[in-house]
């Protein structure tokens, strides 16, 4: 006997649940790729990605996952023998560094932890010591989905500036964009990368790079450029150049709808929704942790991400809990990865997710803990409910931060004065 019959819920940190409206937008025939409506879709997506990244720079769409965006960022701005400084806080910045090393880039990793965020003071000290200016770029992730750490990107930018260093600042926003503020121009970020399958609520298969003025200048002398990733090729005169071939039409249809949904809700409301859902999850975890077995992976409360929470489980097999949650209850939780393989599990609260979805997920986690006899404090779900009650008092109607047509919402969004296509 199981309780899983019905719609399975995906509570992993990517891919995330795809809204029905996005799926419906994709359910259509292929169309002409050289003229007509698809060109409007491409150019509107490129422009709205600038709004999401908050940049006046250029944006590029790749038929690739986030690792493709990593390679595009590196190959378009750096040359063989260049040195980069990798700021680890989990699995993914070091993995980006491994990719850089495979391209002939010299990689230096700062001492890092899965439990603490990047230390801006240490970054400043290392860059001050680089008096010859050998470090050409600093690589960091805003949110690492393995550890669930959120790094303070503005503070790292201030550290770079305090050191008087000219390195490019490259930020992976794959697990953060459209879940929390990301101010590319305001924070002095030179390159931002993300993927379609997390906060952007689109199926996997697209990745995006945003390039600022300094990155575009570095592109002119980069010798790692290859035909597919090359920004110069992507700026060619034909629509075909935007994708270096046939456009991924149906993913673009889905992306267009997902962007409409984000602007319709309003980005401030999107960020606040993620913050409240994350806080409710953390309230539940704090109660469960009273059992002495389950604990937050991230030891610094303010460095706990609003898109995913990683939980350590001491003395018990996380796989058993994940198996019960999926096979009995129909909720798929995230496995521990990297250094947390077989030691942790992850609860996602990103993208197309709301209060009943989170309460269902948290209820299944608490049910699984009880069913498997894993010691835990009682009342975690109630703590999450209390958080919702405190955070969202009855307003008597629809939240004023959202609503309206997608076109009107885009028009009301802060303009970025992006260059035309």
Predicted regions and their residues:
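Conserved PLP-anchoring active-site segment centered on the Schiff-base-forming lysine
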Residues: 78-94
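Conserved N-terminal alpha-helix of the aminotransferase class I/II PLP-enzyme fold
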Residues: 25-72, 91, 95-101
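PLP-dependent enzyme catalytic core of the Aspartate aminotransferase-like
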Residues: 2, 339, 343-421
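Active-site C-terminal subdomain of aminotransferase-like
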Residues: 17-18, 197-284
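Conserved PLP-dependent catalytic core of the aminotransferase class-I/II
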Residues: 45-52, 260-297, 323-324
